């Protein structure tokens, strides 16, 4: 019986999975948390699992297959949880073609891609290949071996079929030949046919009914025939696959005919029995004559011949039944008991997800967008309240409130101004503002340098990629850096725009500070100096107990209450904390997609609805209070004495109140700017790391591709075939010499065999050949037969003598063999130690002289300097 076909495993290069995954985890999850530490440990375990599954030779055992399947399940599990792409987590996987053996001057074909889908396809190929090897190793003489073989062949068939359906969508370019859809489709058919063959062997071993066995064998023959047709025009599979499939198709068909003949005998159809046995004998004879190198069918052939001889004998002497033609026989039925095992993750029965608690990337992205929506809502509400408070402070400062109703004496500093002065001094005064403004350019420059360095890395790698693409043209098959870096460049442009806006904001802050610097400096002075700087005015004691002053104090008190409520509201808005992970995971499980916008808007309205309503109520209350304050202040102004000193004093007090408000706002803005630049530095450092990582990955990919191109170029012939010399096609040679086969670039070209030597001319007895004539070199290695001669070119009989004439002083001297294949066209460049001459010996016909250069002497076969491939 023919042997089973198994598939060689693909080989891969080592890849450090842990480093890029750990870096992503550290950037994504809070530092120092248990979650981050757990995921970092899982990344290390994943890297170890890859080395265990792919970094060592695997035994042909189900335990080794289980390790491969665990790694396959794990990379399928992490695919939706990490952003694997060339411009995010960039991992380049390099795999060699399983069927390409390479050459002496170049390794086997390999492909390097930054694609987890490519890694999945190659790992699944190895799972299928190892399953085929395990099945081929089984002992088919027991039920356990038959069961395991059938199971593994069906799994291998399903795995190859899965690769066929998914490989093109998983890769960004053409795959290597071994995982191309045509090749894996053929392998799937082969594995399915062998699984059916195992069921046929099981039925035969269990001595099931011949009708069932015939149907199983006929179906197996069909499967082998389909596989044979698929690989008929392919030269990528091992050379023994094609004849083995052809032999197995015939053997299975012969088995079907044999068991159907037994059924015909049982039904008293003796002529049909003989016809089927004859067909089976012809099939097996064909196998024995053409594929005996791959299969042994002697026992089965003897079995068929014995049955055929007995059937013919019985029919000739007893039944005399007519033997029908093969085409007149009823077709044998078919019964299939096999099908490709579908690949449903997890495939391994012992799989445990190392990143079980990590949410998918789609959920992470939805959470990021939700966080941005939440931050926008909170910031918008806080900004509205702060703008309203700034507006209220501006209105009060323009009305000189509350200083106006406190300054009834006209010659002391109002208490509100003293409070503001104390606050400014406690916060550091103008020295604080000057220091904060001084730090801004340094922070800005640091961020610009990080951004420019990041973009410089991209520019340099892109320039190198463009140069190599221009040099190698279509051979440079990888994603152009210009296309790959578009998201990063867009992100860099966004950062540059942010920095430009920050510069404008810094300028506005500095301008406002310069316009209020002198007044802020006045607030920093001690109370006596401050009082001296404020003009005095006539007392207005008559207004001390007036109703309008009481109304203004009440309104100002209400306004202060609103400001305090806003501080509480701001804290409430900032402190709200809740997790949308469970809601997004539920939506993903139910619908397969996440409608982030609908879920986020609904949840934000539910949580922040009450707080945003309070913000709007606060804004409306303030609007009403400011109107009432302005009306009451008009009445207050009418009651005050109108003189120049009072007006001047009020103007100074207004400026001091305005300066305080500006000081508070400036300090807040500058601190916020400093915080902004520091946070932006962290973001830009991560951006720089991302750029550095992708550039490093691209350089690694570039080096691999350059190495492959060098090997590919080394395998190419360096020149076209050289035409043979004219004499080789001359009619005088007696036959035409075949043109030489083009040699590889690094191999010496094979020399064509010269034509037969013509008969030597008859020279006068006293004519001696010149001493400079060269003798034919001695043969190298074993002797070979002389070239065939035509009757017309056979030399006449000659007297026998020594093959090489000698000098009288050197009897019997033979020239040492050349250290290389002799080249008659370059003889003069080698200095021989003893140049031999032709010397006519007694009784020997003379050798031809140098006047016949057209016919070089026959030369021994040349030995190449390099091992033949």
From Swiss-Prot:
Positions of the UniProt region annotated as Interaction with TSG101: 717-720
Keyword annotations of the record: Acetylation, Apoptosis, Cell cycle, Cell division, Cell junction, Cytoplasm, Cytoskeleton, Methylation, Phosphoprotein, Protein transport, Secreted, Tight junction, Transport
Record-level GO BP terms: actomyosin contractile ring assembly; apoptotic process; bicellular tight junction assembly; extracellular exosome biogenesis; macroautophagy; maintenance of epithelial cell apical/basal polarity; mitotic cytokinesis; protein transport
Keyword Cytoplasm carried by entry: yes
One GO CC term, this protein: extracellular exosome
Biased composition (Low complexity): 764-787
Location of Phosphoserine modifications: 481, 730
Modified residue annotations for Phosphothreonine: 479, 741
GO MF assignments: identical protein binding; protein dimerization activity; SH3 domain binding
Protein purpose: Multifunctional protein involved in endocytosis, multivesicular body biogenesis, membrane repair, cytokinesis, apoptosis and maintenance of tight junction integrity. Class E VPS protein involved in concentration and sorting of cargo proteins of the multivesicular body (MVB) for incorporation into intralumenal vesicles (ILVs) that are generated by invagination and scission from the limiting membrane of the endosome. Binds to the phospholipid lysobisphosphatidic acid (LBPA) which is abundant in MVBs internal membranes.
Protein name: Programmed cell death 6-interacting protein
């Amino acid at each position: 019986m023919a042997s089973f076909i198994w598939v060689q495993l693909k080989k891969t290069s080592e890849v450090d999975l842990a480093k890029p995954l750990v870096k992503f985890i550290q950037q994504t999850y809070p530092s120092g948390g248990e979650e981050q530490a757990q995921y970092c440990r899982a990344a290390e375990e994943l890297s170890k699992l890859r080395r265990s599954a792919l970094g060592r030779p695997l035994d042909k055992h189900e335990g080794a297959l289980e390790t491969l399947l665990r790694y396959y399940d794990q990379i399928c599990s992490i695919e939706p949880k990490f952003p694997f792409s060339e411009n995010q987590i960039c991992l380049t996987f390099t795999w060699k073609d399983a069927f390409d053996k390479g050459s002496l001057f170049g390794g086997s074909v390999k492909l390097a891609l930054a694609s987890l889908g490519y890694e999945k396809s190659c790992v699944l190929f190895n799972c299928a290949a190892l399953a085929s090897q395990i099945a081929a190793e089984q002992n088919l003489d027991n039920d356990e071996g038959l069961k395991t073989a059938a199971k593994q062949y069906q799994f291998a068939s399903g795995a190859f079929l899965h690769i066929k359906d998914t490989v093109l969508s998983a890769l960004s370019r053409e795959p290597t030949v071994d995982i191309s859809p045509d090749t894996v489709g053929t392998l799937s058919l082969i594995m399915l046919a062998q699984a059916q063959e195992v069921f046929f062997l099981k039925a035969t071993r269990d001595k099931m009914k011949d009708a069932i066995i015939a149907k199983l064998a006929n179906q197996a023959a069909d499967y082998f025939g389909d596989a044979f047709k698929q690989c008929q025009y392919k030269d990528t599979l091992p050379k023994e696959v094609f004849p083995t499939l052809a032999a197995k198709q015939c053997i299975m068909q012969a088995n079907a005919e044999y068991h159907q003949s037994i059924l015909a005998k049982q039904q008293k159809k003796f002529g049909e029995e003989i016809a089927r046995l004859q067909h089976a004998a012809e099939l097996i004879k064909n196998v024995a004559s053409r594929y005996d190198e791959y299969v042994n069918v002697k026992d089965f052939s003897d079995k068929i011949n014995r049955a055929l001889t007995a059937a013919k004998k019985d029919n000739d002497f007893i039944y005399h039944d007519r033997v029908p033609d093969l085409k007149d026989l009823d077709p044998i039925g078919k019964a299939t008991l096999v099908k490709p095992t579908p690949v449903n993750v997890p495939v391994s029965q012992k799989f445990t997800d190392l990143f079980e608690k990590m949410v998918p990337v789609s959920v992470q992205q939805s959470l990021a967008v939700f966080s941005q929506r939440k931050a926008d809502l909170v910031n918008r509400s806080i900004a509205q309240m702060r703008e309203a408070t700034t507006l209220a402070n501006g209105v009060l400062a323009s009305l000189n409130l509350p200083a106006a109703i406190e300054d009834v004496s006209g010659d002391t500093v109002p208490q509100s101004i003293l409070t503001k002065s104390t606050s400014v001094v406690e916060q550091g005064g103008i020295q604080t503002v000057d220091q904060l403004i001084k730090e801004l350019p340094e922070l800005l420059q640091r961020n610009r340098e990080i951004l420019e360095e990041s973009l410089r890395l991209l520019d340099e790698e892109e320039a190198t990629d463009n140069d190599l693409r221009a040099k190698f043209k279509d051979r440079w098959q990888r994603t152009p850096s210009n296309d790959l870096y578009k998201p990063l460049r867009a992100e860099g442009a966004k950062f540059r725009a942010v920095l430009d806006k920050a510069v404008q904001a810094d300028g506005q802050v500095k301008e406002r500070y310069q316009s209020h610097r002198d007044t802020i400096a006045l607030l920093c002075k001690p109370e006596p100096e401050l009082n001296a700087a404020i003009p005095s005015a006539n007392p207005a004691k008559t207004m001390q107990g007036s109703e309008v002053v009481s109304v203004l104090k009440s309104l100002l008190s209400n306004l202060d209450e609103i400001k305090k409520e806003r501080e509480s509201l701001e804290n409430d808005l900032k402190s709200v904390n809740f997790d949308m992970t469970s809601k997004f995971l539920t939506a993903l499980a139910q619908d397969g997609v996440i409608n982030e916008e609908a879920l986020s808007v609904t949840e934000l309205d539910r949580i922040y609805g009450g707080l945003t309503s309070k913000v709007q109520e606060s804004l409306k209350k303030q609007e009403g209070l400011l109107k009432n304050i302005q009306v009451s202040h008009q009445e207050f102004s009418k009651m005050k004495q109108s003189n120049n000193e009072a007006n001047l004093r009020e103007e100074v007090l207004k400026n001091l109140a305005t300066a305080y408000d500006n000081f508070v706002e400036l300090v807040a803005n500058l601190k916020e700017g400093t915080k902004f630049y520091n946070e932006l530095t962290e973001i830009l450092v991560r951006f720089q790391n991302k750029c550095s990582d992708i550039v490093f990955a691209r350089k690694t990919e570039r080096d691999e591709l350059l190495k492959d191109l060098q090997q590919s170029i080394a395998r190419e012939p360096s020149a076209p075939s050289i035409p043979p010399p004219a004499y080789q096609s001359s009619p005088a040679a007696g036959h035409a010499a075949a043109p030489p086969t083009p040699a590889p670039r690094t191999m010496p070209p094979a020399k064509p065999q010269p034509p037969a030597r013509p008969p030597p001319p008859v020279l006068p007895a006293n004519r001696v050949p010149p001493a400079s004539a060269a003798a034919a070199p001695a043969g190298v290695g074993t002797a070979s037969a002389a070239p065939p001669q035509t009757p017309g070119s056979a030399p006449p009989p000659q007297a026998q003598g020594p093959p090489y004439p000698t000098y009288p002083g050197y009897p019997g001297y033979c020239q040492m063999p050349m250290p290389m294949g002799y080249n008659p066209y370059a003889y003069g460049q080698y200095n021989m130690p003893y140049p031999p001459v032709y010397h006519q010996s007694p009784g020997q016909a003379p050798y031809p002289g140098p006047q016949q250069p057209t016919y070089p002497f026959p030369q021994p076969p040349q030995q190449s300097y390099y091992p033949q491939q």
